[in-house]
Each structure stands twice: as C-alpha cells, then as structure tokens.
Regions:
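Bacterial N-terminal signal peptides that target proteins for export
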Residues: 1-8
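Bacterial N-terminal signal peptides
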Residues: 8-16
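Surface-exposed amphipathic alpha-helical segments
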Residues: 32, 44, 98, 103, ...
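Sec/Tat signal peptide C-region and signal peptidase I cleavage site
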Residues: 15-23
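Disordered, low-complexity segments in secreted/periplasmic proteins that are enriched in proline
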Residues: 208-242
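Short, solvent-exposed coil/turn segments at beta-strand boundaries
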Residues: 39, 43, 68-72, 137, ...
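Conserved polar/disulfide-associated segments of primarily extracytoplasmic proteins
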Residues: 50-151, 225, 236, 242
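N-terminal "mature-domain start" segment
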Residues: 22-60, 123-125, 133-136, 195-202
C-alpha cells in the first residue's frame, strides 16, 4: 500500500509538472499591420482567409491564434475598407442594388458576426449577449457554452472599418480570461494606443464610385435604400436573394 501511494504521488507530480510546462509566458503582443495590441500567451500562428459578409461580399480576413494548455485564443480581423468596390462588383437583385447597402454591410458587421459565429451555431448556449465597449470603442460582448462544455468569451468591435473578433475559449472550470479580453488596445499608424474622449462609433469610408449612398459616418440616420419588394424591414433576412 505504501509503495502504491508513492507511485500515485509520483504520477501526480509528473502530471503537475507537465501541466506547468504547457503554460506559456504571456506577453504584450502588438500588431502594426492590423492596428491592435493585447496580452497573449506568446506569439500567434497566422492564417489568411476570406470573410463572407451579410451581403455576400468577400473581404480579406487575418486570424491570429494562440494556445495555452487546453485553452484557445484568437483575434480575427476583417478589413471592410473596400466594401463599396466589392459590393458594387457583385451581381445583386434589384431589391439589393441600392448604393447604401455597401455601407449597411459595414454597419451591421458586428451583429452579423455575432449571429453567424455564435448565436446561430448549433448546440451553443448563449449566456451573455450585450453592448460593450473598450477604451470607448463600442461593440458587442458574448459568453457562450459550447457543446463540449468549454466556454467562449467573445468581444467584437468595429474600428476604422476593421472588424475585430476576440475569442477566448477555455475549459469548463477555468476562470474568465480577463487578461486576454480586457487588454485590447487599438493602435494608430505609428503604433500608439488610440484614446477617445467619448464613445467611438465607426466612420464609414468616403464613397469613391460617384454614388454617395447613405452619407458619411454615423452622423445621422440611414435613408431607406429601397425596401425589398416583399415589404421586409431592415436587413435581407434568411434566404433572401441578393
């Protein structure tokens, strides 16, 4: 019995050492290309891909990923700067051909991402879903329980026409990953942290193709870009042709 206890203790020590070895040193990670900084477990792996927007435009997306033991962290950055050109190049039905829709694609990007990646994902239970801001940049924050009982802490922001999706997925009993989620900073062209004196809402890019669409920034309400023929209100709805 005594020998068994010694073996069990040795195994427990080895497991603890292995778990400790898996933990990574956290650093302040800065990315000048996508203009953000935050605390992360080391350097990321980087994947270039494409993001499909609500109105079927395809935007360049960069996904930065980290792991720390069983926990997974990511920042996805989608650049909506060319929304006008990309939307105009697509073939849309008459219901969705109004120039304002490329702007609506940007303005609705936070809610679109939240719904497509989390709210509508099969087997996911949303336990928190509300307006949020960090450094006065407005966005949305969600907490979800995944089918494998891990928990994802999500924050989504839109800054300078870039969509930022932060996801920290941790084991069932792990503490909330505050060090990752609450350390986000937005950087200017010189790599300095951006600070605002009041709430920041994204400013739309200047139209370049001769049709001004819905106006600039978020300084006033969007005009009706043309209601769909079926009388629907707002957005395109599930399954609606574009």
């Amino acid at each position: 019995m005594h020998r068994f206890r010694l073996v069990a203790a040795a195994c427990a020590l080895l497991m603890a050492q292995a778990a400790f070895a898996q933990q990574k040193e956290w650093i302040e990670y800065k990315n000048l290309d996508d203009h953000f900084a935050l605390n992360t477990p080391g350097q990321p792996t980087v994947e270039k891909t494409m993001w499909v927007s609500e109105y079927d435009s395809k935007f360049p997306e960069t996904v930065y990923r980290w792991t720390d033991g069983p926990n997974r962290y990511s920042v996805s950055v989608v650049d909506y700067s060319d929304s006008e050109a990309l939307y105009t190049a697509n073939h849309h039905t008459d219901d969705f051909s109004a120039p304002a829709y490329w702007q609506i694609d940007i303005l609705g990007s936070i809610q679109w991402a939240a719904s497509q990646l989390y709210r509508l994902k099969p087997g996911v239970k949303v336990t928190f879903d509300n307006f949020h801001y960090i450094n006065l940049v407005t966005g949305q924050q969600l907490t979800v329980i995944n089918p494998d009982m891990t928990r994802s802490y999500v924050a989504i922001y839109l800054h300078e026409n870039r969509l930022y999706i932060l996801d920290a997925t941790v084991t069932r009993n792990a503490p909330a990953p505050i060090a990752f989620q609450q350390s986000l900073e937005f950087l200017d062209a010189e790599g300095k942290s951006v600070r605002y004196r009041t709430y920041y809402f994204d400013k739309l890019p200047e139209p370049k193709l001769g049709r001004r669409g819905a106006g600039q920034g978020t300084q006033g309400p969007l005009p009706d870009p043309g209601a769909p023929a079926n009388g629907g209100q707002g957005g395109r709805g599930a399954g609606a042709p574009r």
